[in-house]
Regions:
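Charged, glycine-rich active-site and insertion segments that engage polyanionic ligands
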Residues: 1-49, 69, 139-140, 149-254, ...
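Residues immediately C-terminal
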Residues: 121, 136, 152
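Conserved adenine-binding aromatic site and its adjacent loop/helix in ATP-hydrolyzing domains
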Residues: 100, 132, 155, 159
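Conserved catalytic/switch belt of AAA+ P-loop NTPases
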Residues: 128-145
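Clamp-loader machinery-focused feature within the broader ASCE/P-loop NTPase space
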Residues: 1-125
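A short beta-strand-to-loop transition that corresponds to the Sensor-1 phosphate-sensing loop
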Residues: 118-119, 145-150
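Short, polar/charged, Gly/Pro-enriched helix-capping and turn/loop motifs at alpha-helix termini
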Residues: 57-58, 108-109, 144, 269, ...
Length: 329
């Protein structure tokens, strides 16, 4: 597990957590909230390891017995709450793993830490049961709730926890991370970082996915050749995309990046800020052939297509309407 100094972004939260350690003002309950892949589990895990570290600093040493156990995920005083069913955390699971356990003092550490990932899955009964422990915790107890949907937590839970909101990470930092840690080439890292929308976790996922790489190449093939495609070729492309419903949202994101690049290049003639800068010859050509009005219409049509698909409109029909707009000049 990394230390705080190795985490990308989230500087304010890290400062807050380090200050809590330094001033010995560690809260008994925290909510880490942010989009999936934003780093909630990494931050909470690093905080837990630091709190239990035998060196007692604001960074985990990584070498003491406590840190080794945390890294090996077998620390007796860092409890990851589990649940049997995929879509719910029940009152019995909260009782068994937290409520009935919390009065037992730590085995070998200053704190006893409970981490509840996907805390929004706790049903109301489970949350109400946990509330009493949050209100009257033993002095050594720390409960960390991780959620991508804080509104699913009861107001009484939210009001009694320190709330830490994870913000999106700057695309430049995400790209740098992918290039330095995963050795992703510059061009591909640019695409992956843009697509990840500020999520390091999502960026790592797409950067190592052959499926995403193939999808990107397929999207580029369509985008570069859409203007010159015969009707039958366009029909085949639409059918191919409409059959890949699982990745449809990803395709539409890639289409948006492309036409934003065309619009940006048309307006600025600059290449450095483009996502698909390696395709500059095609982008330059489309920028010269399309008007600002046409590009705005295409970007608007892409947003409307996303709305239609969320409303379960026929996929093939929604794509036909989109490609009609793309084919206009």
């Amino acid at each position: 597990m990394l230390g705080f100094n190795d985490i990308i972004g989230h500087e304010e939260i890290i400062r807050h957590l380090k200050n809590a350690i330094q001033t010995e003002k560690v809260s008994h309950s925290y909510i880490f909230t942010g989009d999936p892949g934003s780093g909630k589990k990494l931050l909470a895990g690093t905080y837990a390891m630091t709190l239990q570290c035998e060196e007692g600093g604001t960074e985990p040493c990584g070498h003491c017995d406590s840190c080794k156990k945390a890294i090996g995920k077998n620390h007796p005083d860092i409890i990851m709450v589990t649940h049997e069913k995929p879509n719910v955390i029940t009152i019995d699971e909260i009782r068994e793993q937290i409520i009935n356990d919390v009065d037992i003092k730590p085995y070998c550490s200053p704190y006893k830490i409970y981490i509840v990932a996907n805390a929004e899955l706790m049903n109301p009964q489970a949350q109400n049961a946990l509330l009493k422990t949050i209100e009257e915790p033993p002095e050594y107890a720390v409960i960390m709730l991780l959620t991508s949907n804080i509104d699913a937590l009861l107001p009484t839970i939210r009001s009694r926890c320190v709330r830490l909101d994870l913000k999106v990470v700057d695309d430049g930092l995400v790209k740098k991370y992918l290039m330095e840690h995963l050795h992703i080439p510059d061009y591909q890292a640019e695409i992956d970082a843009s697509y990840a929308h500020g999520s390091i976790g999502r960026a790592k996922q797409v950067a190592t996915s052959q499926e995403f790489a193939d999808m990107t190449q397929n999207a580029l093939r369509i985008l570069k050749n859409a203007d010159g495609m015969e009707v039958y070729e366009l029909t085949e492309a639409i059918k191919e995309l409409s059959n890949d419903k699982q990745n449809m949202s990803d395709y539409l994101d890639l289409f948006q990046f492309w036409f934003r690049d065309v619009l940006m290049f048309k307006a600025t003639r600059e290449v450095d800020n483009l996502v698909f800068k390696q395709e500059i010859n095609y982008i330059r050509e489309q920028a010269s052939q399309r008007s600002y009005e046409n590009l705005e219409k295409i970007l608007d049509a892409l947003e409307k297509t996303k709305v239609r698909l969320r409303a379960n409109v026929n996929t093939e029909l929604a794509l036909e309407l989109l490609f009609l707009t793309i084919r206009e000049k």
